[in-house]
Swiss-Prot record:
GO cellular component: extracellular region; membrane; other organism cell membrane
Main location (coarse class): secreted
GO process terms (BP): defense response to bacterium; defense response to fungus; hemolysis in another organism; monoatomic ion transport
Protein name according to UniProt: Opistoporin-2
Amino acid sequence: GKVWDWIKSTAKKLWNSEPVKELKNTALNAAKNFVAEKIGATPS
């Protein structure tokens, strides 16, 4: 119902908000660097 729609739209707004984008990018880069280190490659 309405509550679920509100939860979904709020979650979507949060997911696409700037602070969360920053966090996602930071986490992504950290993961990439971690994997690159493990396999002995340098991230491009």
